[in-house]
């Protein structure tokens, strides 16, 4: 049963349709979208989810958090191949940062630590314990980095289990401050909630914006942190974006971008990852007011703003990146949606290279026996039904009809060129 659930949990709405006895596989993004052009696909190792990415522009290396495999993957972008995998990390890696001045990759880990990995040997050389270390209900996830101050601001979330359905706790989350020069924890800022999902920092290093995924009295909110005081100085309700999960910033025009899921990551398996549409909410950082809210792709997990082009890259776990355009600071429009890959939940826009990168984990591609308008929803429904299957049902030969034919698509890195 565990194997069945694991298989079903990774089945996505990428499928092979049968027509007149022929099997025709429809793989993600084999064409030009008019927004991004797929120019290269690089094989990647490992199973399971991957998380955030970071880049060494000068050395032409990309680093990928192998979340499920507890690894860090190093890719040579010039050669188009993986050059090293750092395995055996202490927990799941989440948000990495490449520090060019020390040639290190610093990454947050779900055991409430931050690790430094040497850029030459690819070995872990330093580990900083955060405030949640040793507490199974707390773990580090998203983070922001201030290169001028050499400080990492790591979000430590509170995660509890209620009868098999994971939910974030109501308080005791924090932003922990790590000095990368001394490899020391130098501060901890208490947050008004349990889920610091999205974190972005002003280039000046004066303010940090944290989108809190907690729903309090019907609203989610942004916690505004004064980094000199190291305290929350404001809380702004996010209308139009019920479950915020990521954040980006246009500091020149005082605009905060919030990527939201439309339902919490609880209850039925799939949770907020699979619900369409998601929401992009634009907020004024001078007033805290919502400027605009637009439909986007589901399962918001990453969001980046490119000042040179005025584009917003909104990445969802539904295997799509939505591109928005800043017409002016008060008006934004959806340019289009580009397929990335199944459960490719994050991506990285690199302005210096004018390229977008999407890491697609190894996943199952389904052969549908019958036509369906929403194969992914059907699979998730079967997964939830499968949770209730008893040993007696299993002995009687119960099985899910959706597992009749499976094709495995191996993990890979998709490399896209910018198109004006």
Predicted ranges, named:
Residues 6-15:
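Bacterial N-terminal signal peptides
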Residues 19-420:
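Predominantly soluble domains enriched in secretory-pathway, periplasmic, or organellar proteins
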Residues 1-4:
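Positively charged n-region of N-terminal signal peptides that target proteins for export
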């Amino acid at each position: 049963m565990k194997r069945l659930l694991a298989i079903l949990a990774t089945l996505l709405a990428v499928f092979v349709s049968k027509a007149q006895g022929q099997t025709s596989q429809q793989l993600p993004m084999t064409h030009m979208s008019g927004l991004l052009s797929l120019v290269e696909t690089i094989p990647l190792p490992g199973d399971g989810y991957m998380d955030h990415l970071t880049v060494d522009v000068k050395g032409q290396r990309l680093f990928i958090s192998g979340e499920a495999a507890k690894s860090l993957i190093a890719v040579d972008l010039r050669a188009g191949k993986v050059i090293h995998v750092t395995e055996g990390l202490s927990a799941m890696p989440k948000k990495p940062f490449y520090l060019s001045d020390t040639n290190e990759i610093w990454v947050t880990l779900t055991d409430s630590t931050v690790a430094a990995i040497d850029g030459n040997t690819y070995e872990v050389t330093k580990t900083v314990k955060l405030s949640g270390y040793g507490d199974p209900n707390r773990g580090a996830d998203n983070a922001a980095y201030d290169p001028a101050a050499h400080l990492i601001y790591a979000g430590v979330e509170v995660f509890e289990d209620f009868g098999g359905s994971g939910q974030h706790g109501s308080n005791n989350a924090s932003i922990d401050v790590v000095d990368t020069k001394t490899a020391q924890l130098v501060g901890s800022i208490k947050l008004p909630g349990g889920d610091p999902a999205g974190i972005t920092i002003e280039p000046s290093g004066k303010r940090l914006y944290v989108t809190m995924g907690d729903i309090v009295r019907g609203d989610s909110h942004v916690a505004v942190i004064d980094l000199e005081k190291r305290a929350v100085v404001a809380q702004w309700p996010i209308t139009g974006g019920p479950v915020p999960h990521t954040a980006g910033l246009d500091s020149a025009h005082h605009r905060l971008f919030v990527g939201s899921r439309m339902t919490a990551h609880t209850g039925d398996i799939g949770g907020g990852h699979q619900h369409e549409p998601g929401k992009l909410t634009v907020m004024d950082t001078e007033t805290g007011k919502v400027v605009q809210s637009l439909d986007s792709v589901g399962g918001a997990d990453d969001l980046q703003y490119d000042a040179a082009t005025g584009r917003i890259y909104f990445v969802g776990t539904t295997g799509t990146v939505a591109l928005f355009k800043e017409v002016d600071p008060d008006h934004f429009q959806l340019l289009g949606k580009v397929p990335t890959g199944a459960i490719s939940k994050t991506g990285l826009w690199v302005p210096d290279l004018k390229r977008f990168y999407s890491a697609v984990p190894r996943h199952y591609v389904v052969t549908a026996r019958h036509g369906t308008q929403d194969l992914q929803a059907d699979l998730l429904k079967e997964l939830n039904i499968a949770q209730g299957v008893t040993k007696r049902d299993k002995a009687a030969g119960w099985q899910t009809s959706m597992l009749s034919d499976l094709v495995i698509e191996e993990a890979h890195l998709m490399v896209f060129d910018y198109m004006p």
